């Protein structure tokens, strides 16, 4: 981690008032920490757009395990991309529905493609990819 540098920011008073309200709502101790988080979030979003860069994330799927061959198709897709999958969690929500969470890490384009293949598989009721950074380039 580098040296901490102080710098000034000029803001419109209405914008500052809204920012202070956001800081209070999210329990930031200081404006500086809120600004650091905003900068980090912007840098992480930039990582997601770089298709060759490694990213991390989770893919959450909800599906009816009674659907013909669905579990087998999902497993085959996962085995095709096993190097992207760190771990999985399978939960029985009720008699019919399952929730599966995959923790993923790899090149952004491959992670997105895997998520798209799984969520678009016939029988999947809902799929949600949530991306984050590997943390390697953040201070």
Swiss-Prot record:
Gene3D superfamilies: ACT-like. Chain A, domain 2, Met repressor-like. This is Putative nickel-responsive regulator. Keywords: DNA-binding, Metal-binding, Nickel, Transcription, Transcription regulation. Belongs to the transcriptional regulatory CopG/NikR family. Binds 1 nickel ion per subunit. Its cofactor is Ni(2+). The keyword Metal-binding applies. One of its GO terms (molecular function) is DNA-binding transcription factor activity. It comes from the Bacteria. Transcriptional regulator. The keyword Phosphoprotein does not apply. Ni(2+) binds at residues 79, 90, 92, 98. One of its GO terms (biological process) is response to nickel cation.
